[in-house]
């Protein structure tokens, strides 16, 4: 959360404020960005699936218009969420990241997972409700760990087949039922590269709205084993010197922060700011 942006449950029946429009193609933008006067946005010919009040930005209420499909709006275009993460105002990215998570949840929870009937939006909390089942569905958050494995002046980096060509990153994976974050870390490192770790140190967390992860970041020391890459998950993995690193993840990601923080400490450089 930032001083400019705070989340809140707002009643869509209230008037005024700002709004963002999200479709399967991304967020609607114009020359001024992705936040529009709400009254103007609702006058456009948009295929609205639902509307949610999501918080306040610079003191103004903000609403999400979740759309069934993209619509041409004069002077506007559609832009994916990752583009906002990589460049531009990080506070706006936080608004849109939250909006994307709420939009995904609202789209996926229109019907009860137990009986199949339509669910209704609760006005006073972030939940969808099935009256026959007395069942509430809340926005999904998927906890996952992300870890930089270290060995003195070397760090273990890997690349997935899904990565941008040449980029290496830290190891990561989702927590399983019954696991602590530390249990998940040990298992995922063992599964992905077949090495063991020790001295696990928590560093920080980051919301990762692609679509609904909570990344718990760690440093861990190498304890033994030879790298054996997990088929289909890891395309390459190797040890890199802190003096000679490959192309790395985006600067606003916790993956990049874990790397930059360790390198700064080893080289005696200034500690980087956390991407919060």
Curated annotation (Swiss-Prot):
Catalytic activity, reaction form: a 5'-end NAD(+)-phospho-ribonucleoside in mRNA + H2O = a 5'-end phospho-adenosine-phospho-ribonucleoside in mRNA + beta-nicotinamide D-ribonucleotide + 2 H(+); NAD(+) + H2O = beta-nicotinamide D-ribonucleotide + AMP + 2 H(+); NADH + H2O = reduced beta-nicotinamide D-ribonucleotide + AMP + 2 H(+)
A single GO cellular-component term on record: cytosol
Binding site for a divalent metal cation 1: 172, 192, 233
Domain Nudix hydrolase, first and last residues per copy: 139-262
Binding annotation for a divalent metal cation 3: 188, 192, 233
Binding of Zn(2+), residues: 112, 115, 130, 133
Presence of keyword Protein biosynthesis: no
One Pfam short name: Zn_ribbon_NUD
EC number: 3.6.1.-, 3.6.1.22
Cofactor note: Divalent metal cations. Mg(2+) or Mn(2+). Binds 1 zinc ion per subunit.
Cofactor dependence: Mg(2+); Mn(2+); Zn(2+)
GO-annotated biological processes: NAD catabolic process; NADH metabolic process; NADP catabolic process
Annotated residues for binding of a divalent metal cation 2: 188
Listed InterPro entries: NAD-cap_RNA_hydrolase_NudC, NADH_PPase-like_N, NudC-like_C, NUDIX_hydrolase-like_dom_sf, NUDIX_hydrolase_dom, RNA_Hydrolase_NudC, Znr_NADH_PPase
Family: Belongs to the Nudix hydrolase family. NudC subfamily.
Role according to the record: mRNA decapping enzyme that specifically removes the nicotinamide adenine dinucleotide (NAD) cap from a subset of mRNAs by hydrolyzing the diphosphate linkage to produce nicotinamide mononucleotide (NMN) and 5' monophosphate mRNA. The NAD-cap is present at the 5'-end of some mRNAs and stabilizes RNA against 5'-processing. Has preference for mRNAs with a 5'-end purine. Catalyzes the hydrolysis of a broad range of dinucleotide pyrophosphates.
Subunit structure: Homodimer.
HAMAP family: Nudix_NudC
Name of this chain's protein: NAD-capped RNA hydrolase NudC
Organism annotation: Pseudomonas putida (strain ATCC 700007 / DSM 6899 / JCM 31910 / BCRC 17059 / LMG 24140 / F1)
Chain's gene name: nudC
């Amino acid at each position: 959360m930032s001083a400019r942006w705070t989340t809140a449950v707002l009643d869509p029946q209230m008037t005024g404020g700002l709004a963002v429009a999200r479709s399967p193609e991304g967020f609607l933008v114009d020359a001024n960005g992705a936040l529009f006067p709400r009254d103007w946005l609702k006058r456009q010919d948009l295929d609205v699936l639902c509307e949610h009040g999501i918080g306040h930005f610079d003191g103004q209420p903000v609403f999400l218009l979740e759309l069934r499909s993209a619509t041409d709006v004069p002077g506007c275009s559609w832009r994916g969420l990752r583009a906002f993460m990589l460049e531009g105002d990080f506070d706006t990215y936080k608004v849109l990241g939250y909006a994307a998570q709420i939009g995904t949840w609202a789209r996926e929870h229109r019907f009860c997972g137990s009986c199949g009937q339509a669910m209704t939006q609760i006005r006073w909390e972030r939940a969808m409700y099935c009256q026959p089942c007395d069942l509430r569905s809340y926005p999904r958050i998927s906890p996952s760990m992300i870890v930089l494995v270290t060995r003195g002046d070397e760090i273990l980096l890997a690349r997935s087949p899904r990565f941008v060509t040449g980029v290496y990153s830290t190891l990561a994976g989702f927590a399983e039922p019954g696991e602590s974050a530390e249990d998940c870390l040990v298992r995922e490192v063992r599964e992905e590269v077949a090495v063991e770790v020790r001295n696990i140190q928590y560093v920080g967390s980051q919301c990762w709205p692609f679509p609904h992860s909570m990344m718990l970041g760690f440093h861990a020391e190498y304890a033994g084993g030879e790298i054996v890459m997990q088929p289909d998950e890891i395309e390459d993995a190797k040890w890199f010197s802190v003096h000679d690193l490959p192309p790395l993840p985006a600067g606003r990601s916790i993956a990049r922060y874990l790397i930059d923080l360790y390198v700064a400490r080893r080289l005696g450089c200034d500690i980087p700011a956390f991407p919060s």
